[in-house]
Amino acid sequence: MKKDIHPDYKVCTVTCACGNSFETKSNVETLKIDICSSCHPFFTGEQKLVDAAGRVEKFKAKYNMAK
């Protein structure tokens, strides 16, 4: 491989909007993100269920398609 053509690979501090921070390696020193595994609903178990049946009923009522 050629020398001096690759960017520097250094320790990167990743900071989330929720306040959580962790370190990884990257070519930048700091990285700010909006959501991480500490605050994402999938990882925290705070998922909300979508009520698809209610949406269908609302559509039918709106366009008078109910029987």
UniProtKB/Swiss-Prot annotation:
The GO biological-process annotations, alphabetized, read as: translation
What PROSITE patterns is this protein classified in? RIBOSOMAL_L31
Give the matching Gene3D superfamilies. Answer: Ribosomal protein L31
Assigned keywords, A-Z: Metal-binding, Ribonucleoprotein, Ribosomal protein, RNA-binding, rRNA-binding, Zinc
User: Which top-level group of life is the source organism from?
Assistant: Bacteria
**What does the note under cofactor report?**
Binds 1 zinc ion per subunit.
How is this protein annotated for GO cellular component?
Answer: ribonucleoprotein complex; ribosome
Xref: NCBIfam families: L31, PRK00019.1, PRK00528.1
Q: Which protein family is it in?
A: Belongs to the bacterial ribosomal protein bL31 family. Type A subfamily.
Function per UniProt = Binds the 23S rRNA.
> Per its UniProt record, what HAMAP family does this chain match?
Ribosomal_bL31_1
Name of the protein in question: Large ribosomal subunit protein bL31
